[in-house]
């Protein structure tokens, strides 16, 4: 086999379809987020505003987080020195897991090197722990959930997105005695819509199923202490396993699950993705713990309120211009263009001509024909920056003769 030719064909296919991913080299400046500097391909530098980051609340720059990380770094050094089982468990990891468990009202938590690995490792391990487990998965679940569900082959049922009637139809058709788990998300990141948590929990109770919720795009962002949509809606006690991230609203790095002590102990003991991975650096654990603790407070609520206000303002301004946005009331602002080449072109022009950095979102992240720009306004974006973004979008939409009819929600 000509391996180089095969690689060339694979990469060329992405170019031909307009979905080859280009990394934008940026340098964030401490204390200045969302401002950054773009290292242009021609060697020049350009000041930009980041509009597509997952540091939703700017906590990656917060003095409380940085102070905790500096203190830990000076106290114990850089790496953890091992897996959790072999010299890699520290007081920082223990405190972080206790903070997470308290956040979700659970007995225990387990920290992974990413939320992707937490999903993959946990869902695949549940098949080992519960032989014959049937997993019911929302059709728009994240890739990490899909991979975990596919691993350790077992029965799975895919229900139409947020369609609880279809879920009930599928679960009612299966063996009542079989172990069951419903896996879904609280906020779906590409459309910004919410999962029907209460209705899914009702079905789980009726059929004796476990509930597994991915709150990656919700933790830190919703609820009086930032525990997510389940907390906001008073439903945390009805969820068996929470998955979350430390790398989005909390602004640091890593992922986790929170559940009963018995469930966490079993996953800890059986999940290869946990057992054979080096643990988080102590400074990372310290920063994440400080971020979670801060966002539980009234000061954290002020950040959430400011973020929601900026998201509403941006949506209102874009709607007034007839932009094809999808608005489900979340913090995510998708603007649908519907063509990968056009989406990339608009993204490139926003960056080079206006200093607005928003990454194009193409297939397979979203279905073909729904390619989009996905804006994530934060509390540290100001109204002047929103004005600049809206002005740039208006000019480019006219220049490129793009559709101004509102997208279907």
Curated annotation (Swiss-Prot):
<feature type="binding site">
    <location>
        <position position="156"/>
    </location>
    <ligand>
        <name>succinyl-CoA</name>
    </ligand>
</feature>
<comment type="pathway">
    <text>Porphyrin-containing compound metabolism; protoporphyrin-IX biosynthesis; 5-aminolevulinate from glycine: step 1/1.</text>
</comment>
<dbReference type="GO" id="GO:0003870">
    <property type="term" value="F:5-aminolevulinate synthase activity"/>
</dbReference>
<comment type="subunit">
    <text>Homodimer.</text>
</comment>
<dbReference type="InterPro" id="IPR015424">
    <property type="entry name" value="PyrdxlP-dep_Trfase"/>
</dbReference>
<dbReference type="InterPro" id="IPR015422">
    <property type="entry name" value="PyrdxlP-dep_Trfase_small"/>
</dbReference>
<dbReference type="GO" id="GO:0006782">
    <property type="term" value="P:protoporphyrinogen IX biosynthetic process"/>
</dbReference>
<feature type="binding site">
    <location>
        <position position="365"/>
    </location>
    <ligand>
        <name>succinyl-CoA</name>
    </ligand>
</feature>
<feature type="binding site">
    <location>
        <position position="137"/>
    </location>
    <ligand>
        <name>succinyl-CoA</name>
    </ligand>
</feature>
<keyword id="KW-0808">Transferase</keyword>
<dbReference type="InterPro" id="IPR050087">
    <property type="entry name" value="AON_synthase_class-II"/>
</dbReference>
<feature type="binding site" description="in other chain">
    <location>
        <position position="245"/>
    </location>
    <ligand>
        <name>pyridoxal 5'-phosphate</name>
    </ligand>
</feature>
<dbReference type="InterPro" id="IPR010961">
    <property type="entry name" value="4pyrrol_synth_NH2levulA_synth"/>
</dbReference>
<dbReference type="InterPro" id="IPR004839">
    <property type="entry name" value="Aminotransferase_I/II_large"/>
</dbReference>
<feature type="binding site">
    <location>
        <position position="277"/>
    </location>
    <ligand>
        <name>pyridoxal 5'-phosphate</name>
    </ligand>
</feature>
<keyword id="KW-0350">Heme biosynthesis</keyword>
<keyword id="KW-0663">Pyridoxal phosphate</keyword>
<keyword id="KW-0012">Acyltransferase</keyword>
<dbReference type="InterPro" id="IPR015421">
    <property type="entry name" value="PyrdxlP-dep_Trfase_major"/>
</dbReference>
<feature type="binding site">
    <location>
        <position position="21"/>
    </location>
    <ligand>
        <name>succinyl-CoA</name>
    </ligand>
</feature>
<comment type="similarity">
    <text>Belongs to the class-II pyridoxal-phosphate-dependent aminotransferase family.</text>
</comment>
<dbReference type="Pfam" id="PF00155">
    <property type="entry name" value="Aminotran_1_2"/>
</dbReference>
<feature type="binding site" description="in other chain">
    <location>
        <position position="189"/>
    </location>
    <ligand>
        <name>pyridoxal 5'-phosphate</name>
    </ligand>
</feature>
<feature type="binding site" description="in other chain">
    <location>
        <position position="217"/>
    </location>
    <ligand>
        <name>pyridoxal 5'-phosphate</name>
    </ligand>
</feature>
<feature type="binding site">
    <location>
        <position position="278"/>
    </location>
    <ligand>
        <name>pyridoxal 5'-phosphate</name>
    </ligand>
</feature>
<feature type="modified residue" description="N6-(pyridoxal phosphate)lysine">
    <location>
        <position position="248"/>
    </location>
</feature>
<dbReference type="InterPro" id="IPR001917">
    <property type="entry name" value="Aminotrans_II_pyridoxalP_BS"/>
</dbReference>
<feature type="active site">
    <location>
        <position position="248"/>
    </location>
</feature>
<protein>
    <recommendedName>
        <fullName>5-aminolevulinate synthase</fullName>
        <ecNumber>2.3.1.37</ecNumber>
    </recommendedName>
</protein>
<dbReference type="GO" id="GO:0030170">
    <property type="term" value="F:pyridoxal phosphate binding"/>
</dbReference>
């Amino acid at each position: 086999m000509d391996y180089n030719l095969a690689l060339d064909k694979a990469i060329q296919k992405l170019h031909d379809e307009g979905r080859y991913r280009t990394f934008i080299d940026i340098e964030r400046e401490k204390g200045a987020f969302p401002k950054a500097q773009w290292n242009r391909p021609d060697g020049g530098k350009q000041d930009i505003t980041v509009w597509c980051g997952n540091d939703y609340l700017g906590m990656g720059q917060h003095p409380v987080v940085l102070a905790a990380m500096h203190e830990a770094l000076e106290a114990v050094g850089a790496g953890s020195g091992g897996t959790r089982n072999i010299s890699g468990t520290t007081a920082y990891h223990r405190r972080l897991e206790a903070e997470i468990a308290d956040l979700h009202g659970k007995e225990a938590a387990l920290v992974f090197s990413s939320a992707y690995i937490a999903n993959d490792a946990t869902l695949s391990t549940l098949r080992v722990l519960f032989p014959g487990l049937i997993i019911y998965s929302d059709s728009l679940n994240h890739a990490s959930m899909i991979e975990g569900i596919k691993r350790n082959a077992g029965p799975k049922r895919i229900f139409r997105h947020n369609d609880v009637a279809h879920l009930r139809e599928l679960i009612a058709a299966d063996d009542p005695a079989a172990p069951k788990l419903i896996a879904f998300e609280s906020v779906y990141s590409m459309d910004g819509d919410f999962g029907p948590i209460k209705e899914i929990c009702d079905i789980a109770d009726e059929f004796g199923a476990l509930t597994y919720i991915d709150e990656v795009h919700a933790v830190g962002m919703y609820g009086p202490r930032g525990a997510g949509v389940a907390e906001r809606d008073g439903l945390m006690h009805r969820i068996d396993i929470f998955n979350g991230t430390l790398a989005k609203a909390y602004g640091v790095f890593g992922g986790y699950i929170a559940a009963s002590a018995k469930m966490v102990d079993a996953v800890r003991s059986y999940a290869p993705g946990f057992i054979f991975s080096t643990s988080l650096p102590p400074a990372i654990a310290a920063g994440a713990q400080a971020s979670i603790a801060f966002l539980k407070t009234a000061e954290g609520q002020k950040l959430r309120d400011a973020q929601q206000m900026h998201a509403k303002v941006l949506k209102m301004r874009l709607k007034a211009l007839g932009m094809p946005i999808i608005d489900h009331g979340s913090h995510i602002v998708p603007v649908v263009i519907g063509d990968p080449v056009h989406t990339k072109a608009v993204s490139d022009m926003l960056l080079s001509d206006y200093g607005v950095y928003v990454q194009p979102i193409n297939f397979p992240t979203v279905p073909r024909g729904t390619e989009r720009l996905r804006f994530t306004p934060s509390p540290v974006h100001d109204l002047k920056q929103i004005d600049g973004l809206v002005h740039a979008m208006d000019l480019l939409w006219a220049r490129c003769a793009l559709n101004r009819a509102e997208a279907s929600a």
